Design a protein with these regions (language model features):
Chain A
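Amphipathic alpha-helical segments used for helix-helix packing
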Residues: 112-138, 149-155, 184
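Hydrophobic/aromatic residues within well-ordered alpha-helical segments
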Residues: 74, 78, 82, 104, ...
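Amphipathic alpha-helical segments in well-ordered regions
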Residues: 31, 77, 108, 154, ...
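Secondary-structure edge/capping motif, primarily at the C-terminal ends of alpha-helices
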Residues: 86-93, 122-130, 158, 186-190
Length: 219, 444
């Protein structure tokens, strides 16, 4: 009996520790994002981040070794946020496929909008093969896989409904590549409110769904 | 920017080409079927329906100016077969639009906030679609019912692309002189003006003030705090569009009353305000069973230098019959200062016959014009054809002509009988409007 309570307390304590750790991680990320939005990715130092987050610089390194780790954490968090938003949004449940996919990218862009400069910097960094942000790093691959599964499930639903023909895993890969293209376009879009990106996104998704529906692979 | 524009233009070119190809394809299919099976009237009707549905779908996807062209075509009652017309008239209100998520995103792109952060309630399903956007119902935080018009993203560059294509497509017509270059430019200017909702808000204010004497007319009020150049929030207006209104079978008296009021509105705008609501497609009018009228969509407004009172004087007095100088003056009024006199004279006989119907000379004659009169239509199309053949279209009259054509189309659909002469007499004599006119001019 006693042992059991002790065990429970231990689990509870560990739970609390994990929770606290997550809390600090989020506080650091919030501080960093604020600085990135104001000063830019390159000019923000770990020193200023730790000062803003109200922790010692040494503590910061316990959580994030480099600024790249911070960026990775940011992308993981925003992917989790999108999945959660998608699963709880009532409109997305009954929308047609082009609208669902539009909603996902639009939601992503909306959350990225304040950190445009930061995203641009991360894009450049990810081109370096040794970078943790490179699409071939294990961390990036893990996140990418989670994203592919998320999209794959949405496409599978549309396949079930007969909205599009069976695409297999290729559909999710194609959409991921498309999303990279859209973000690149978005970064360079100087129209007000980035409405050119909205138009591009809408037309591409409507047309591709239309063509897939019409002829599948045979057209 | 330029590069993107080019890509869009190629895309549109491809789609237009596809439209042409797919139409030709099914025409050929029809011919082959015809050859094998012999012609049946039933099949012909069905075929027309299919072809025009395809036209409508493709135009809907293209949006922008090409769709406007579709709308213009659909107003040419006698040019297209009845079935094609019915399909095309769907374009006027029910154009394929943005899904709720896109409309919401575009709202934010324009106003910086999502609609649910601005309004107490916002209906994500649009209740009306226009070629440049769509309209959603909403309720403001203070509880007022409003209509929110949201523009399709990047429609402006889409229109510019369409006109680049239109210019090359109309090159033969322009070279032969049947289509003045100025006309295409004027249409482009008109369409581009329609994309600026700030301009439209100014127009709404101008006409609300200028036409306030016409108590049967309602024009929406603008909520500037929720409007930009791409989103326009207006007070909600009750009423039904023409097609739905006619389904209720309104009495001839109500239809005549509405017809007379529409004519009065048109004459008042031309004569007193010197500005005309030039987009007379039926979706812009809302009718109520007691004869009240709501006028919405003020995107296309034409400032007019058209001297309607001088022209009406000519029509009523047949001045051109009095001397050659008077005849020249009359032609200048209709076709502009550089009118080729000889060619204009060829149009005169048809014009005189039209005039005898619309403005009968004999004071005792029944001056009521039945807009369903086939004779009127026959003369009307003869007149348009003559003008085209004699190359008499003055560029500055393009949009006024479009407005008048639209008005006549509505009067035809309505089956209204209007005493045009009397309407003009009353508008001209309405001294009370004088003050409103100066008010409106001041505010503009």
């Amino acid at each position: 009996m006693k042992r059991r309570t002790g065990g429970l307390r231990a689990v509870k304590g560990r739970g609390k520790r994990v929770e606290n750790k997550e809390k600090t991680k989020r506080a650091i990320l919030r501080a960093a994002l604020e600085l990135f939005a104001g000063k830019g990715f390159y000019r923000t130092t770990t020193k200023t981040i730790s000062r803003k987050a109200g922790i010692a610089e040494g503590t910061l390194f316990n959580y994030f070794e480099t600024k790249e780790d911070l960026a990775l954490y940011f992308f993981e968090e925003s992917l989790s946020e999108i999945i959660q938003w998608y699963e709880h949004d009532r409109r997305m449940k009954r929308a047609a496929l082009p609208e669902k996919l539009f909603g996902i990218i639009e939601h992503l862009l909306d959350s990225l909008a304040p950190y445009e400069e930061f995203i641009g910097a991360v894009y450049l960094r990810s081109l370096a093969p040794a970078s943790k942000l490179s699409p071939f790093s294990l961390q990036s691959q893990e996140r990418h896989l989670r994203y592919l599964r998320f999209i794959r499930d949405i496409l599978a639903e549309a396949e079930e409904e007969g909205e599009i023909p069976r695409l297999g895993d290729l559909g999710a890969h194609a959409f991921a590549a498309f999303q990279v293209g859209v973000i690149t376009y978005w970064l360079q879009d100087s129209s007000r409110g980035k409405e050119q990106t909205l138009a591009l996104l809408d037309r591409c998704l409507k047309l591709s769904t239309h063509f897939l529906k019409k002829g599948g692979w045979d057209w | 920017m330029n590069r993107n524009g080019k890509r869009g233009m190629l895309g549109r070119g491809f789609q237009l080409g596809k439209l042409g190809l797919s139409l030709v394809g099914s025409y050929l299919g029809y011919q082959a079927q015809n050859f094998l099976l012999g012609e049946g009237e039933q099949r012909k009707v069905r075929f027309h329906q299919q072809a025009s549905r395809r036209v409508r779908d493709e135009l809907g996807v293209l949006k922008g100016a090409v769709m406007k062209l579709g709308q213009l075509l659909s107003m040419q009652s006698k040019v297209l077969p009845e079935e094609a017309l019915r399909e095309l008239s769907d374009l006027q209100m029910r154009a394929p639009g943005m899904h709720a998520t896109l409309a919401r995103a575009q709202f934010k792109a324009a106003l910086g906030k999502y609609p649910e952060d601005v309004f107490r309630e916002f209906d994500s399903e649009p209740f009306a679609a226009a070629s440049l956007g769509q309209v959603h119902r909403a309720i403001t935080r203070s509880g007022e019912r409003v209509a929110v018009k949201i523009q399709y993203p990047a429609i402006r560059s889409a229109i510019e692309n369409d006109f680049t294509l239109l210019r090359s497509a109309t090159l033969p017509g322009r070279l032969s002189g049947h289509l003045p270059t100025g006309l295409v430019d004027e249409f482009q200017k008109g369409f581009l003006e329609e994309t600026d909702y700030v301009q439209e808000a100014d127009n709404l204010d101008f006409f609300r003030k200028g036409l306030s004497g016409l108590t049967y007319l309602t024009i929406p009020r603008v909520y500037r705090e929720f409007s930009t150049d791409r989103v326009l929030t207006m007070s909600h207006i009750e009423g039904e569009i023409l097609g739905d209104f006619l389904k209720r079978k309104p009495s001839a008296a109500v239809r005549d009353l509405i017809g007379t009021r529409l004519a009065e509105m048109f004459d008042t705008q031309l004569h007193w305000l010197k500005k005309v609501h030039a987009d007379h497609h039926p979706g812009n009018y809302l009718f109520r069973p007691d004869g009240r009228i709501g006028l919405v969509d003020f995107g296309c407004v034409k400032r007019s230098h058209f001297e309607i009172s001088a022209l009406m004087h000519c029509y009523l007095e047949r001045t051109w019959q009095k001397s050659e100088a008077a005849e020249r003056q009359f032609f200048r009024l209709i076709f502009g200062p550089k009118v080729p006199h000889k060619r204009a004279r060829k149009v005169l006989p048809v014009l005189e016959r039209l005039c005898d119907i619309v403005y009968p000379r004999d004071a005792s004659a029944n001056a009521v014009v039945d807009f369903r009169d086939p004779k009127l239509h026959e003369l009307g199309s003869q007149y348009s054809w003559h003008i085209l053949r004699e190359k008499l279209i003055p560029p500055e009259c393009g949009l006024i002509g479009r407005a008048q054509m639209g008005l006549h189309h509505i009067l035809y659909e309505l089956g209204a009988r209007v005493n045009a002469k009397e309407v003009w007499r009353q508008v001209f004599a309405a001294g009370g409007i004088e003050e409103r006119k100066s008010d409106a001019l001041k505010s503009s």
